[in-house]
C-alpha cells in the first residue's frame, strides 16, 4: 500500500466512525498533540472527535538522511475522541484491518507506556502498540493538558505512518518507501531532510534563536493577556520549536534546559486556562447535543 493511500484509508475509516477529518496545523510542532485540535479540544466538557495527518519536527532527531528509520521531520496520524468510547481498542484493531493488517494473523501487543509532555503540561496513561515486534502506535487516555484535568477523558491514538508503511511495504528504510506509484519518500523528502539538518546542527545562529525565543515569549504573554487564545498558542508553539532548535545546536545547559521547559509549560497552562474561560463565556456551544457536563 502506498504511503498516501495509508492516509486515505485512515481518513475513510475514522470518517465513518464519526470523526471530523482535518488538515495539518500550519506551525512547526514536535507532535500532533500540539495541534490545537488536540491540545485545546482535549480539555473542557465539550465532546470532540477528530482525525488528521500531522507533519512533525524534532530537530535533534535528524541524521542527514543517513539513518533508515530516524529523521527530524516525519508524519503522524492523530485521532482524538472525547469522551473515549467503549470498544476503542477493537476499533483501532479494525482500523489496522482497513490497512490490510489482519490482527488475527499478526502479533499485536499493547505494552504499558504512560505518556508525558513536560512543555505542554500534559500527560496520560496508555500503551505503545507493537506490531510483530515494532512499535507503530501510541494509545493514550489523556489525564491533563496544559495542567488542566481532562473531564471527560479523551482517547488519543497516534499512528506512526512511516513505520506502518515500512511494515506494509516490507522496507528496511523510510527513504525507500513508495509514496505513490511514481515517487519514493526520498524523492520528496531527502533533500529537505539534508538541508534542514544542516541548519539544525550547523548553520542556525544560537544568538538569534535565543532572541527569537524572547520575542515569541513576549508575544505569547501579550496575547494571553488579551484573551486571544489561538494566536497565543501559535507563539507558544514557536517557543517550543525554538527551544528544540537550540537543543539540537547543543547550546543549552542542563540548568537552561529546565528553565526553558518551565517557561513554555507556564505559557501552555495559561493558554489552556484562557481557552476554558473563552469556551465557558460562549456557554460551551458544542454541548448542545450532549446530555452531560463535566466540570
Swiss-Prot record:
Keywords: Aminoacyl-tRNA synthetase, ATP-binding, Cytoplasm, Ligase, Nucleotide-binding, Protein biosynthesis. Gene3D superfamilies: Bira Bifunctional Protein, Domain 2, Class II aaRS and biotin synthetases, domain 2. The keyword Aminoacyl-tRNA synthetase applies. Its EC number is 6.1.1.14. One of its GO terms (biological process) is glycyl-tRNA aminoacylation. One of its GO terms (cellular component) is cytosol. It catalyses: tRNA(Gly) + glycine + ATP = glycyl-tRNA(Gly) + AMP + diphosphate. SUPFAM superfamilies: Class II aaRS and biotin synthetases. GO terms for molecular function: ATP binding; glycine-tRNA ligase activity. InterPro entries: aa-tRNA-synth_II/BPL/LPL (IPR045864), Gly-tRNA-synth_heterodimer (IPR006194), Gly-tRNA_ligase_asu (IPR002310). Transmembrane segments: none annotated. It is found in: Cytoplasm. HAMAP family: Gly_tRNA_synth_alpha. PANTHER family: GLYCINE--TRNA LIGASE, CHLOROPLASTIC_MITOCHONDRIAL 2, GLYCYL-TRNA SYNTHETASE. Tetramer of two alpha and two beta subunits. Belongs to the class-II aminoacyl-tRNA synthetase family. This is Glycine--tRNA ligase alpha subunit. It comes from Prochlorococcus marinus (strain MIT 9215).
Amino acid at each position: 500500500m502506498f504511503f498516501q493511500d495509508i492516509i486515505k484509508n485512515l481518513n475513510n475509516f475514522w470518517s465513518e466512525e464519526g470523526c471530523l477529518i482535518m488538515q495539518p496545523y500550519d506551525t512547526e510542532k514536535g507532535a500532533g498533540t500540539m495541534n490545537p485540535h488536540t491540545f485545546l479540544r482535549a480539555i473542557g466538557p465539550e465532546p470532540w472527535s477528530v482525525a488528521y495527518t500531522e507533519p512533525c519536527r524534532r530537530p535533534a532527531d535528524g541524521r542527514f538522511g543517513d539513518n533508515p528509520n530516524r529523521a527530524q521531520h516525519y508524519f503522524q496520524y492523530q485521532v482524538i475522541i472525547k469522551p473515549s468510547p467503549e470498544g476503542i481498542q477493537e476499533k483501532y484493531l479494525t482500523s489496522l484491518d482497513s490497512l490490510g493488517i489482519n490482527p488475527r494473523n499478526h502479533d499485536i501487543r499493547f505494552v504499558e507506556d504512560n505518556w508525558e509532555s513536560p512543555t505542554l503540561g500534559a500527560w496520560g496513561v496508555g500503551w505503545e502498540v507493537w506490531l510483530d515486534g515494532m512499535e507503530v502506535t501510541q494509545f493514550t487516555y489523556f489525564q491533563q493538558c496544559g495542567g488542566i484535568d481532562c473531564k471527560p477523558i479523551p482517547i488519543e491514538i497516534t499512528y506512526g505512518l512511516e513505520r506502518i508503511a515500512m511494515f506494509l511495504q516490507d522496507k528496511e528504510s523510510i527513504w525507500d518507501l513508495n509514496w505513490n506509484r511514481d515517487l519514493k519518500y526520498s524523492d520528496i523528502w531527502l533533500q529537505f531532510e539534508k538541508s534542514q539538518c544542516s541548519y539544525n546542527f550547523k548553520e542556525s545562529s544560537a544568538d538569534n534563536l535565543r532572541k527569537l525565543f524572547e520575542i515569541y515569549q513576549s508575544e505569547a504573554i501579550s496575547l494571553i493577556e488579551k484573551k486571544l487564545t489561538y494566536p497565543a498558542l501559535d507563539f507558544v508553539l514557536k517557543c517550543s520549536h525554538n527551544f528544540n532548535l537550540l537543543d539540537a545546536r547543543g547550546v543549552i545547559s542542563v540548568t537552561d534546559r529546565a528553565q526553558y521547559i518551565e517557561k513554555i509549560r507556564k505559557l501552555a497552562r495559561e493558554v489552556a486556562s484562557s481557552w476554558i474561560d473563552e469556551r465557558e463565556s460562549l456557554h460551551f456551544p458544542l454541548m448542545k447535543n450532549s446530555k452531560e457536563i463535566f466540570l
